[in-house]
Amino acid sequence: VVFLITADTDYLINFNPDFTNPKTYVGVNPEETTAYWINEAEKQGYEALYQAHYADYTALFNRVKLNLTNSSDFRDMPITQRLSRYREGQKDFYLEQLYYQFGRYLLIASSRPGNFPANLQGIWHNNVDGPWRVDYHNNINIQMNYWPACSANLSECTWPLIDFIRSLVKPGEKTAQSYFNARGWTASISANIFGFTAPLSSKSMEWNLNPIVGPWLATHIWEYYDYTRDKRFLSEIGYELIKSSAQFTVDHLWHKPDGTYTAAPSTSPEHGPVDEGVTFAHAVVREILLDAIQASKVLGVDRKERRQWENILAKLVPYRIGRYGQLLEWSTD
């Protein structure tokens, strides 16, 4: 038995949304597109559909081979048995190879150009209404989904994230201006496909206040360029987004009386108090300013602003070391 299923949405991504227009995110009629697709699929038949799927998937998946052991021992062992042995402390490099490739497979299956980026639980979870509305959490979750994308030779799978970030820029400019009196754009801990960039409605700033997550998202734009060396992408799409994020970062920093700069107020993602110069925030500040500096050099633009970024970077409060020799997460032990 062959089941053919199609699905679509009337959602249309919009990089320049008009929030006075209730249809600013409305595109195609899904009844028409799904009917067309199902008819075309029926014409193709199972074997042709399977071969097209296999060619599409393996073109990405087969790019990377990972071999942690040359041993062929236990390669046919069932996964349940492997996991049981692994939990007992027995080494299984082949299981680790499988897990790495499983992660690549999940990204291939959930993040392709023209679609939404991978979200909190994915679309195949076992709930009618998934935890946290299965949205996009910008304070580590969506970044974590894409950490291995380029390094695992799946740069195409980054495009849904790139487009999602682009869709946050215009509403993020309003958030930057309204909440922080800053240039540029930013986002908050939670976002959705309809341009939501403001903090959530809560008095608990320890987890809800995290304006530096916008620049954290923007670092993925430079990472994509860094791997692909697509200068046209950097010039036409990437640089302005990175630059605008760096401008927000500059305006958000506190220029202290001693001449140094620090992120204040700042928080560590959903962990600990509101503080001055949280290490997480300073790490992101350093990265986005470095990305902006490098991008402007590659394109040979904005030398004056680049000098400002370099000056602030040099005067950013350094990471602090605690009484036990540890890297402090907050300003004091």
Give, region by region, the residue ranges found by the protein language model.
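Conserved hydrophobic/aromatic pocket- or pore-lining residues that grip, position, or stack substrates
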Residues: 103, 145, 217
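Acidic/polar, glycine-enriched structural segments that form the non-catalytic walls/loops
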Residues: 1-136, 155-175
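Alpha-helical scaffold segments in carbohydrate-active enzymes
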Residues: 56, 98-109, 164-167, 171, ...
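Solvent-exposed, acidic/flexible segments
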Residues: 89-96, 100, 138, 142, ...
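Alpha-helix C-terminal capping/termination sites
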Residues: 89, 96, 108-109, 145, ...
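Active-site lining segments of carbohydrate-active enzymes
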Residues: 87, 153-156, 160-216, 225-226, ...
